[in-house]
Amino acid sequence: MTPEAATDRGLRLLVSLTRGGARLNRVVARSQTAFKNLAEGFLTHALSGAEMSSTTVALYGVDAGAYETQRSLSDWERDWYEAVLPPAPARVLVTAAGKGREVAALRSMGYTVDAFEPVESYVERCSKLAGDGLVLTADYLDFCRAVLDDGQGPAAPLAGRVFDAVILGWGSLTHVLTRDEQQRVLAASCALSPQGPVLASFFARGATAARPESRVGRLGAAAGRLVGRFRGVSAAPLQIGFFWNLGFTYAYSAEDLEGLAATVERQLEWQPEPYGHATFLPPS
C-alpha cells in the first residue's frame, strides 16, 4: 500500500469514527432527555413538597463541581449589588450560601458577612471565607423557625439579629417550592433586615419553560399520579420542574413576585434577564 493510499484510508476511518461518535452522542443526549422527562413527570406527581425539597438538598450536595467557590460574581450580580446594597462595611446575611461564592465576593468588597447553608461539607468551605462572620448549618425551614416561630433550632443564633441587607444565595429562591414557604422565607428575611433590601435570584417564568409535554413525560406523569393517589399526594403545579443537577425548581412570574412583595409590604424591583433577580425594598 502506498503512503497516499494509507493516508486516505486513515482519513476515511477517522471520518467514520467521528460520525459514529456524533451519532452515539445524539443517542445518549436523547436518552438523557427522555429519562429526565420521565423522572420529572413521575416525581412531580408522586412526591410531596417536603420530599421534593429534601431531594433537592441531597442532589445539590452531590453535584459539588457545579458550585465552586472560585467562580466570581457575574456582571449582572456585581451591577445589582453595587446598585442596591448599602455601602460597606454594612453587615449582610447570605442565605443558602453554598461554598461561599457570594461570601467571598462581598468580603472582598469590604462587607461583614454572616451566612447559612444546608450542606455540611459546603459549610466548612464557606466558613473559611467568612472571616469573623457567623456561618451556620441550616436550611430555610430552620431559618423560618428561628426568626418567625420559637427562636430555636440550627438557625437560632440568627434570631433577633439585625442586618443591613439579606441576599438569598444564588438561585436559592427557585428551590422554595410552595407559596407558603416562599412567603415565610421572605418574611423572615425582611424581619432581619427591616430597613434594608432583600435580594433574591430565581428562574423567571418567561426564561424557563414549564414542564415539557413529551410522550415520555406524560407516561411518567401517569405513573406518578397512580402513586400519588395511593400516597395521598397532590401533583405539583406546572411551575415546578426537575433537573438532575439542581433538583426541583419553581419558575417565578411577575404575578408571583408582586404577590410576595405585597405580603411583606415591600416595594418590588425585578429583572427577568439575564437571570431572574428581584430586590424587595422597604417602604420609602
Language-model region placement:
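Conserved class I S-adenosyl-L-methionine
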Residues: T7-G98
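Class I SAM-dependent methyltransferase SAM/SAH-binding core
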Residues: K99-G151
